[in-house]
Amino acid sequence: MEIINGERLVLGTCYYPEHWDESLWRDDLKRMLENGIEVIRIAEFAWSKIERYEGVFNYDFFDRFLDVAADMGMKVIFCTPTATPPAWLTEKYPEVLNANMDGVLYRHGGRRHYNYNSPKYQELTTIIVEKSASHYAKHPAIIGWQIDNELNCEKNEFYSESDTIAFRKFLMEKYGSIDALNEAWGTNFWNQTYNSFEEVYVPRTTLSNNTNPHEVLDYTRFVSDSACKFAKLQSDIIRKYIKPGDFITTNGLFGNLDNQRMTNESLDFITYDSYPNFAYCLDAYNKDNFLKDRMWSRNLSEVRAVSKNFGIMEQQSGANGWNTGMAAPTPKPGQMTLWTMQSVAHGADYVSYFRWRTCTYGTEIYWHGILDYSGRDNRRLAEVKSVHEKFQKLSEIAGSKYEAKVGFLKDYDNAWDSQLDVWHEKVEWKSQLGIFEAAQRTHTPMDYIYLRDDVTAEDLKPYSVLFYPHPVL
């Protein structure tokens, strides 16, 4: 089964069998199928369910679950679990941890606390992905794979010792000599001149928190390069084992990452995590904000710039919050339908709701899913079924192209440069937001187009109007 095949629209949800007693599995899957959910995503935070102790692999848990899924006709997207390394790993190998700008390591207990450039983490990632893919990939329930989870989410800067070593290598390959680097970075200013690459570090705290903008732009390129290589490391392994027709994806879009490059190198298509009610969180209620959840049309247009047709791996289905912060209120009746159709209108052929059951423990205890804590049927589940019925009538739009005559030109270097320049950032963002809001107010379809080496004049010919505000590079 392919979920992006141009033939029909497909509904899914995110499920965590490790959170629930096995006696609930069959009933959960049965209720999903009865309400139009055909696909589930699993295992993105479950490293210890496969490798509880270093080098000791146990496949029984997910073997049992996948067999139940296959027996009931539920299809599965299986994830690599590298977003949350287990405690034994970070305790034994602290060099895998990411650090803040002052070099203080982020410790076990959260997620995404590793760094891409640790040779040890790359080694252990290779092992867990190889073991998982070689064992599970041929299972009939599995139709695709998700790499990691939300690459560059929460933290898209890396300051560990491994990152400094990798950054030096990145710069040596780019410039060839330290003199060329000094010239490009303008290091004569404030006597920043380097005599060797060993004197260069990832950006660190300085007296006035000032930065060399040329260094930081190269550093941002390096972060993107590191994330792309980490995704490709995993994709190359999975490709050796997957069944014909199965796919590889990951869920984005996050900062300091060239999503087009990552998709072209490692994925069959990209997916996105869509939480439109973030627009209403906290003090946003008091703001005169015309766009509100229509702001997510801008985000979805960015996704469409990466993949013409894409998937939504996490579509908001409930109130959102961690124990440390409030994020978004419960969708009103009909809002799940609105947001789902918003995603479909922008090119999503697959929409997966986050999550099936609301977790009863952990940081995301207030991040509600389709079902509340009781697990009983509710109005949101009824709305999912209603969406499925609508999908049945909309199959002819699967694989169709979003038609726009207005294009907004972007490129990563200018986007990254603007975020490190307080003068340029405000002007660029205000222009971008103003153009998007004008398009929304006039119901004018608009595309984002990223200028890359493979973009030609022919690619721009369909547009009657092109905006390219404030490029400085």
Predicted segment positions?
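Carbohydrate-binding surfaces of carbohydrate-active enzymes
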Residues: 197-200, 244, 275-278, 284-473
